[in-house]
Design a protein with these regions (language model features):
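Residue-level marker for the onset of beta-strands and adjacent loop->beta junctions
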Residues: 7, 34-35, 63, 85, ...
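Vicinal oxygen chelate
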Residues: 1-2, 11, 76, 80-118
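Short hydrophobic/aromatic beta-strand element in the GNAT-like acyltransferase core
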Residues: 38, 66, 97-99
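Helix N-cap motif at beta-to-alpha junctions
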Residues: 15-16, 70-73
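N-terminal beta-strand motif that seeds the catalytic metal site of vicinal oxygen chelate
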Residues: 1-17, 45, 62-65, 114-118
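Conserved short beta-strand elements that form part of the metal-binding/catalytic scaffold
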Residues: 28-62, 107-113
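Short amphipathic alpha-helices within nucleic acid-binding modules
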Residues: 22, 73-78
Length: 118
C-alpha cells in the first residue's frame, strides 16, 4: 500500500453546529460544500462527529493537530477571546507553537516554523 494523502481528520464534538461555527468564524476555515459537519483547510478536511448522538461516550482528542498561522501569539489571543482554553505557548528553536483546546476540549496546535528542517 502507498498512502497518497490525508483526506480528513475526524474531530469529536458535543455540538456539530457550534464546532463548525468555531472553526469557521475563529479560524476562518470555509464550510464544506458537500457535508454540513465539515470545514476545509487548504489540504485536509476537518470532519466533526457527535459521538453521543451515536450512543458513544464523548472523549476529546488530546493528541491534536497543527495548523500553520502567520502569527502564533496573535492567533492564540484570537482563540482565547473566542472562549478556547490556552494550554501553553512554546518556542522549540525551530517553530513557535500555541497549544489550545477548542470549545469541546480537543487539542489544536497553532504553529509557525521559522527555521529550515534539518
Amino acid at each position: 500500500m502507498q498512502v497518497e494523502q490525508v483526506d480528513f481528520i475526524s474531530i469529536p464534538t458535543r455540538d456539530v453546529s457550534r464546532a463548525v461555527a468555531f472553526y469557521r468564524d475563529v479560524l476562518g476555515l470555509p464550510e464544506s460544500d458537500s457535508r454540513p459537519a465539515e470545514v476545509e483547510t487548504p489540504n485536509v478536511t476537518l470532519s466533526f462527529w457527535n459521538s453521543e448522538a451515536d450512543g458513544e461516550e464523548f472523549v476529546p482528542s488530546i493528541g491534536g493537530f497543527a495548523v500553520r498561522v502567520a502569527d502564533v501569539a496573535a492567533a492564540v489571543e484570537e482563540v482565547r477571546a473566542a472562549g478556547a482554553e490556552v494550554v501553553g505557548i512554546d518556542d522549540t528553536g525551530v517553530c513557535h507553537m500555541g497549544f489550545v483546546k477548542d470549545l469541546d476540549g480537543n487539542t489544536l496546535i497553532l504553529h509557525r516554523r521559522y527555521a529550515p528542517r534539518g
